[in-house]
Amino acid sequence: MCGIVGYIGTCQAAPVLLDGLSKLEYRGYDSAGIAVYDGNKIQMQKAMGRLKVLEEMTQNGATLPGTVGIGHTRWATHGAPSDLNAHPHFNKDHSIVVVHNGIIENYLKLKKKLMSKGYEFLSETDTEVIAHMLDYYYNGDPLATITKVMHRMEGSYALGILFRDHPDEVYAVRKDSPLIVGTSKSGNLIASDVPAVLKYTRDVYFLENEEIVKLTRDGLHFYNIDEEELQKEPTHIEWDMNAAEKGGYEHFMLKEMHEQPKAVKDTLTPRIKNGDVVIEELGMTDEEIRAISKIFIVACGSAYHTGVTAKYIFEKLARIPVEVDLASEFRYRDPILPENTLVVIVSQSGETADTLAALRLAKEKGVRTLGIVNVVGSSIAREADNVMYTWAGPEIAVATTKAYSTQLIAQYLLAMKFAKVRGTVSQNDFDAMIQSLERLPEQISLLLSHKENVQRFANRYLAAEHVFFIGRGIDYAISMEGSLKLKEISYIHSEAYAAGELKHGTISLIEDGRLVVAVLTQPEFYKKTISNIQEVKTRGAFVMAVTTVGNTEVEKVADYVVYLPETNPIFANSLAIIPLQLFGYYVSIGRGLHVLVS
């Protein structure tokens, strides 16, 4: 999740840019850079590492004269962290410079076209493609050029752009990636988020999708993609700086839960093309996919729970046997890895010690490895044979939410890809699954919009000492993650059990008033899990059920029911986890444990 700032006004730009970037450090980054027009040319400084490196290089901006500029903190998506891959990026003669937050899905196609026209690339980024595209179409009119490029780019982006021959203008663009505009007596600003501008103004404009703004020293001009001028009204921000960093949410965990629809979409959309699953980074031919005889999924914590879900889906769709291992166990048990085995390593950071050790063990044994990670250039990303990135952005809260959700998406896509290549899924079923996946971001948003209902229920159980989660099949995997969320942020003892195992000892722990959370998203298990609910009700338990809309039978036995939008049952985890995340969050803050979700 990159940070963008831009400024034009009466003050020296570089110190303003550096100050704004410092207010966006909470978003996470691996490099930083700024570009300033000094009255003659555009000067640029950028460096890998903390913002402090850039501040020292420029003497806190003093070495870069000029009152117009743009800046950027980068969270790597295309290309590892490096000075060359850091933003801003120039065109060939340094007359156009760009900063970018987002993902250009068709950048390889655009890059190939530009290279055929003689353009040379210095970095591995998708952003450099934008700079050269602007150069290719530039006709002296920045607005017309920007709209031409917008029509040809696919994906999400927020852009800040300088044109050397328009020295008194800064341009900014938004499509599916946030960007705000601020106005003050000393100048006008753009930024990815409110904290970057609060020192200068509390009056901001929120750009909508496919809108463009031209900033001058005297004013702002807004346009749509058809170059029609728009009238917009500012919003006055009342938040303090701490609240602004959290986007107006009380805690980072709540903010990150609300970022899940976008994170899921960002991970999903680039890999669905023309109704098919396209995983270019997989690095496996169809013949190699068909040759895979066994899959191991190795991870820790919440990532392990996504692997448990993926096991059910891989085996159901692709008919490949799958083992799921905790990395801390896998690395020490001398696992038997037959020829034609694929080991999938899942980690948000790409640096989890046990998971990294498991990867190295798999490589020592000579089997193919695939990393599913969130951090570009991390150890697992570098050492795995191939890597599939989740585009969750940085997580600040203790408990993972959006990284978990994007890891699920990556593994759904992987299972579907394998099933399609191996011929174990019909075209009709495959098409229906694509449609279900594409609806998930909107459905997650809908569930988040009803968070107050979960909060009211959570407030009734703040004094709970023991909570049990139950489910069958994929629902058991969901229960494991729901239980972990509750215990790690509320300090309440919580356990997840396969519902069919209750009778083997666990039922003796169910007492009058004990809270049981039952997950029922798999139609083939509805009756059996309802029977399990009846068992715990007989012993005096209070039951919260999470189920799919239409399963009204559960109302007869559960005390409280959360209904999920209809989806393909194999993807239900992505929806069922939302109320369980919210439940853990609201119990935690209700018990005064704000530090664990901040």
Per-segment meaning from a language model:
Residues 1-246, 250, 262-293, 332, ...:
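Conserved short alpha-helical segments that host acidic/polar catalytic motifs at enzyme active sites
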Residues 67, 71-84, 273-286, 310-346, ...:
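Glycine-rich oxoanion-binding loops at beta->alpha junctions
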Residues 180-202, 328-362, 503-535, 567-581, ...:
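Glycine-rich, anion-gripping cofactor-binding loops and their flanking helix/strand elements
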Residues 227, 542, 555-557, 567-598:
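Generic C-terminus detector
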Residues 260-264, 268-296, 386-515, 588-598:
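Active-site phosphate/pyrophosphate-binding segments
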Residues 290-432, 436-439, 519-562, 583:
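Glycine-rich phosphate-binding loops that contact phosphosugars or nucleotide phosphates
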